[in-house]
C-alpha cells in the first residue's frame, strides 16, 4: 500500500519542510515501494531537496561476505531547479537491481563479473546462479556496503521497522511481498540559506 501512503503523506511532508526547513517521513510495515524517483522528484518540484531510501528482504552480501544481509537498498535523491526539471537519480546500493538480474536470466544474458556470487560464494556472470540461491554484491565493495548499512539504519532502525535480514525471517512465504520501512527527507533550501 505504499502508493496510497505516499499520495496522502507527501503533501504533508512538503508543507512541514517549507514551514520548518527540514521534515522527515517514516513509513513502516509497507510492501515494495518500486522506484523511488517519482516521490523525490515530486518533492523537488515543490522547491525542496529530497532523499529517500528503503530496505527490503536480504539479497546482498556485505563486501567480503557470501551470505545476504542487506536488501538491494535503493536510494533516490532529487535537487530542485528554478524553471527547470529537477536533477533526480534513483539507484540500488547493490551492484545491480535484482529486477535487472531477473531480466538478464529470462533473456539469457550474462551480467558483469562482480555483480554477484553463486550459492557457494563463487564469482559468476550467470544471472541464474545469482537469482536462484546466490547473492548480489554491493556496488563499490566496502564503500557500497557502508551505504547499504546506512539505508538499513535509516529505513529500518530509525523509522522503527525491520532490518532486511529480519524482514526475511518474518516473511511467511505465502507468495505475498514482505514488508519494510522507508525514510524520506525533505529540506527547504530557502529556509536553510
Question: What residue spans do the PLM features occupy?
Answer:
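Metal- and O2-centered redox machinery and metal/ROS homeostasis
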Residues: 3, 11, 38-39, 135, ...
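Short glycine-rich or small-residue beta-strand-to-loop segments that form or flank ligand, phosphate
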Residues: 23-28, 138, 184-189
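Phosphate/diphosphate-binding glycine-rich loops and adjacent basic-rich segments that engage nucleotide
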Residues: 60-128
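Secondary-shell segments that build the walls of catalytic and ion/ligand-binding clefts
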Residues: 106-165, 170
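Catalytic-core signal marking the mid-to-C-terminal active-site face
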Residues: 165-193
Amino acid at each position: 500500500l505504499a502508493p496510497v501512503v505516499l499520495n496522502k503523506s507527501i503533501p504533508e511532508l512538503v508543507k512541514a519542510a517549507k514551514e520548518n526547513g527540514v521534515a522527515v517521513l517514516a513509513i513502516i510495515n509497507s510492501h515494495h515501494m518500486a522506484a523511488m524517483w517519482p516521490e523525490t522528484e515530486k518533492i523537488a518540484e515543490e522547491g525542496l531537496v529530497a532523499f529517500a531510501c528503503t530496505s527490503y528482504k536480504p539479497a546482498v552480501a556485505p563486501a567480503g561476505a557470501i551470505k545476504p544481509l542487506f536488501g538491494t537498498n535503493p536510494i533516490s535523491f532529487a535537487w530542485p531547479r528554478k524553471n527547470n526539471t529537477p536533477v533526480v537519480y534513483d539507484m540500488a546500493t547493490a551492484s545491480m537491481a535484482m529486477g535487472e538480474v531477473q531480466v538478464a536470466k529470462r533473456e539469457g544474458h550474462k551480467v558483469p563479473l562482480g555483480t554477484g556470487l553463486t550459492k557457494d560464494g563463487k564469482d559468476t556472470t550467470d544471472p541464474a546462479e545469482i537469482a536462484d540461491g546466490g547473492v548480489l554484491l554491493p556496488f563499490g565493495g566496502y564503500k557500497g556496503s557502508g551505504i547499504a548499512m546506512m539505508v538499513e539504519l535509516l529505513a529500518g532502525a530509525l523509522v522503527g521497522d525491520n532490518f532486511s535480514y529480519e524482514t526475511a525471517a518474518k516473511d511467511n512465504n505465502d507468495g505475498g511481498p514482505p514488508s519494510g520501512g522507508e525514510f524520506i527527507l525533505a529540506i527547504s533550501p530557502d529556509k536553510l540559506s
